[in-house]
Amino acid sequence: MGLKLCIHRGTHQIGGIAAEISTATTRILIDMGDELSLDPNFVSAPLNIPGVTDTDGCCDAVLFTHYHGDHTGQTLRIRPEISLYAGALAKEIMLISARHWCGPYRAKSRCRR
């Protein structure tokens, strides 16, 4: 039973981090962020990860290292049944950000501490 590490995005840039740790029975994503740019018109490319943003596979949880947008910016793309984990401060800031950008109906208290 081996441990696998997959970097989905973030090896050739600052920001837009998404990595995954998995075994034969468990899959955990670490961060799901937006890419960074100095261009004010830049829009981060949607990050599509099978089992996380669609139903082609499964994911047990997503762990957020901290609340910066380059680590949490694509949180709302994560399937709602996947558990989200973050520290107390990160959770609070992520909920405030979700309410600001999407309204309270999308900002569910899904994060666990």
Residue ranges of model-derived segments:
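Hydrophobic alpha-helical bundles that form the membrane domains of multi-pass transporters
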Residues: H66-Q74
